[in-house]
């Protein structure tokens, strides 16, 4: 059985003072590392990545992400996986509210989407604003998040409003991890005294698509109770996203339905109130065949800090006293129930067409590790990046003085198309050696 395991963290809320001598949260982060070394390695066979469902930073500042990167590297080191094996989505704390508060244009764009009464009108307005090449108002507040996330290929833009990554299971199945953004509209009016929290916008373009032989794991910061137009979105999400991971609420629960496994994660760094209890999770996913139907098996291991705050242990209140929660989803039966009225030969045509517009798909047949190549490239200096791209004729000397992050990403895509990624990586490693 080809099992895939993941470590799931949420709401870490790194601040600039994290790891300072007076940082009282450092001990609990170290306790997570110890729990992974002693208990996770004993229970999990094949850790494929680290999943982070938002609020990586506290204020969306670059210094906070540098600290986050160092910690996530430590988590990866426990399982001897690459530092690029991190998958993340932004939360409301990953939005730099100073950027929003200082720009009437951003605030106006957010409110223009927020005030729409139907999801179709909201989607139309959203599309209008993200198509503005002069000033992309709805992405500007997460510039620092994108600088951090680009090394994992989890950055988002008008050209890629969600990301996805494929893993291989048995029974001719792939596990597709999809990361969507629920924080486009986040601003100072999210939480106002005496008012209900503002609802967040998730457009129809972020709903995962159907595809043959694919099981979907969805990552999103805000859970469905925080969504605008939930009644329009959630039924389709439930049909298409078999496993769903959420953060934001800082309270942990697992919802098991016949056709879904949904994890509402607690926070690694919750606010220190009377019910303060840090939590995180392990997840194992595998597949099998029964009666010629393919079954997706999901195991969730909820973890929480012990009462004496000394270490992490089984979250028995969430797992009903067991080591983990186990659930099986009959994928073939679920897909048939959702789609049986459609002709087999055209079953996924429309959705696959939508997917190709903004995919980040791992091509398992390729002999190179694209994620590591891109991660390493973003670890070298801006000057070295420009030098390499110029040497490989991926940019011109004339454009090198005008480069921004988007143009760098486009140059990397050209390296893919021109089959120059291996050469780019070789030059990247040479730069790293020169700078040691």
Question: Where do the protein language model's features map onto the residues?
Answer:
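Active-site environment of divalent metal-dependent phosphoester hydrolases
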Residues: 15-17, 57-60, 90-103, 187, ...
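Active-site-proximal beta-strand elements of phosphoester/diester hydrolases
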Residues: 3-18, 174-186, 217-220, 262-267
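A short C-terminal boundary segment appended to hydrolase-like catalytic domains
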Residues: 287-431
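Conserved beta-sheet core of the metallophosphoesterase superfamily
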Residues: 172, 224-298
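Active-site-proximal segments of metal-dependent phosphoesterases and phosphodiesterases across multiple
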Residues: 21, 182-246, 254
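N-terminal active-site segment of His-dependent metallophosphoesterases
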Residues: 1-67, 71, 79-86, 96-98, ...
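Active-site neighborhood of phospho(di)ester-bond hydrolases with catalytic His/Asp-centered motifs
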Residues: 8-10, 48-55, 81-92, 216-225, ...
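Extended active-site neighborhood of metal-dependent phosphoesterases/phosphodiesterases
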Residues: 69-192
